Structure formats: C-alpha cells, structure tokens
UniProtKB/Swiss-Prot annotation:
The keyword Transferase applies. Its EC number is 2.4.1.317. Disruption phenotype: Cells lacking this gene produce demycinosyl-tylosin. The gene is tylN. It catalyses: 5-O-beta-D-mycaminosyltylonolide + dTDP-6-deoxy-alpha-D-allose = demethyllactenocin + dTDP + H(+). It comes from the Bacteria. Keywords: Antibiotic biosynthesis, Glycosyltransferase, Transferase. Belongs to the glycosyltransferase 28 family. It comes from Streptomyces fradiae. This is O-mycaminosyltylonolide 6-deoxyallosyltransferase.
Amino acid sequence: MRIALLTMGSRGDVQPFVALGTGLRARGHEVVLGAPEALRPLVEQAGLEYRATPGDPDGFFTMPEVVETLRRGPAMRDLMKALPPAPEEYDQEVLDRIERAGEGVDLVVHAPLTVTTALGEPSTPWLSVNWWPNTSTWTFPAVESGQRRMGPLTPLYNRLTHWRAEREDWGWRRAEVNEFRGRRGLPPFGKSSPLRRLGHPRPHLYPFSPSVLPKPRDWPGQCHVTGYWFWDQPGWRPSPELEDFLADGEPPVLLTLGSTWPVHRQEEMVEYAVAAARGARRRLLLVGGPEGALPGDALRVPSADYSWLMPRTAAVVHHGGFGTTADAVRAGVPQVLVPVFADHPFWAARLRRMGTAARPVPLARMNREALAASVRTAVTDPAMAVRARRLGEAVAAERGVENACVLIEEWAETRTTAHTPG
C-alpha cells in the first residue's frame, strides 16, 4: 500500500507520524509524510518521502497574541478568540494544500489539524488520529475544558464538557469546511459536528498508553488506544560535554519546554529552575531555552534523544506536550509538568492522580516557591519514584506502533470502495 500521513503543527505533531511511518515502511508499505517545511529534515532523517503541508511551528509561539494569552491561562477558547482572523481565501488555500499532499496514495491517515479536509469527501479512504482523547465520554472531562482534576467529577458534568468542546470546535471550523465543500458541489453541514462520528465508521487512533489512560467503556468500537508511538533517533550520540556533565555527579533535574519555550519568561524560568534543582541538591540540565551564561551546576544542550537522556535524570520538568510526556513516562522518572495550553493540563492532572508526577505548576501561576516545592517532591519522594519506574516499565513493554500498523492494515483490507463522509 502507498500511505500518506498528513499532519501540521510542531515537532510534537510530526514525530509520532515519523514513528508510525517508519513502522509501516518496515512492513513493506510506501509512506509519504506531509509536514511543515521547518520539519522536513526530521522526516528525511527517518528516510521517509516528504510532502509539504502549511504552517510555521516556530512562528506560532512567538506571536504576541499567543504569548500574552497563554501567560494568562491555558484555555483554548481564549486563545482562539485572541488570534487575528485569517482571510477566507487563506483558510481555503490551507485546506487545498493539505488535500494535495494526500494525492496519489491508497490511504490517508489524518492528524487533528488536517482531518478537516476529509470532510470534503475525497475518493481516497482515510482514517484519523488524535494526540489527546477527544471522543465524548462519561469517564473524564474534555481536554479542551482545561479541567485540572481527573475526579471525582460527575459523569454528567464530564459529558457536558465534551458537548461544549465539540460545539466550540465546530463553531471555529464550520464556515471554512462548508466553503470547502461548496467548492466541490457538496451541501453544507449544519450545527452538529460531523467530527463527532470519528471512530464510528472508520478507525480513530489514540497513540497514548492504556497504562496511562485506558479506553473508556462507552467509546465506539473503532476508537483504539494503541500505546505510544516512539521513534528513537538512529545514530544519535551525546556530546562529550553532556557525557562529562552527567558523569560528574548525581543525575540532574532536566528542564525541557519544547516548542513552548518562547511563551515563557525564559531567563526567569531558568533562574527558578536552577534554584529548584539546588533546593533538591541536584544540578540542572536544559534542553533548548535561552542562550547565555549558566552557573557551573547547570548545562544547556540544543537538543537530545530523550530515550537516551531522560532515564539518566532524577526528574523531568516539562510543558506536558504529548510527545515529551510520552518520553518522560517511558523513562520511568518522576515529573513536574508546567502546562501551557491544549492537552497539557489534562496530562498534568492525569499523571498527578497516578502519583508519578508532583503538583503541576501551570505557566500562568509560575513562581519560584511552587516550582521548588514540586521539584523537591519529584526528586525526594521514594514512593513516587517507584510508581514512575513501574509505569515506565509497563509503557516500554507496549507495542504502540505495531498495534497501529495492524489496525491500519486490517481496516484497509476491508476497503474496496470510497468512504462515506463523516
């Protein structure tokens, strides 16, 4: 089969598809991966065919509207309201470019930011993926609600948060989808979102661990929690400086904020993190972050293979993005999450409830004392360390990519005609 994996966004939106694409290729399939131009080197490093999709992952988090809004709080609705409206013709060009990236294949796998194009009823069969659990359930609140507790909340409340999130999401998408459909001679959708049926007629894959979040019993049969999709960088080697730093003392505290670094008050964040690590009698290791001089008990590296680095640390402080969270969970070390937006508060609440992460310190409420207290707990709590290690062992034993490949292949075998919409 020739399969297109289409995504937009930051590295965290692309690397899981690199893992999936590598797995599919190993099983004899041809794979093309659509991603923003800035992430082309990542796709090509994995030996996958690259196709361009729109987006500037670096530019988004430097937009003044984004920085100002996220420093106030993580709510998606506030962020969407703050963004300047895009011209209608721009929205349609984005959808057209995504559609073109998926041409000439037997099957398309859509990520959250590209699935809208599937509502134009293409002739190529498609299925979908989401990094966080966006299927309605009585079991837990909607990710988009920003709810910081995983329970005890009433099932009715949980369901209402999903209804509201679905309504708001469709409110943002509806006009551009109907314009897209209209240009293809298709009737418009009404007020009810067709995306609510993801996981009913075709697979809707969730590449997180069932050890972290089991599949709710009220989800449709075609919603699948596969396990994480890991891609460990082939041939990656640490620098001599990094190896020397790690060898020169006890495991350090790791601080990595991924693509959200620009949203933070970066120098202040580093200052707080250095102090927090010292309070736990540890050194600090940064991945990314601001350039500039650091004290002797801290080191900055521009990037790293987390599968190698994280198990060599005492605790990981991170933003709670899907990919970084997965790596930290598999590493089996305690965590401190600094949620910024989207799914970050959800994973922070979940890991806190599981006892593998200390109290989260949201960006909007960041202060020296709170970060120090959480880092100290993560480094010194022996029960948390045991729980984190056991969870890491369970996740490491899962076969997320293999599970996803089998599901894709089995469903594709049943497809001999074009799909039905929605």
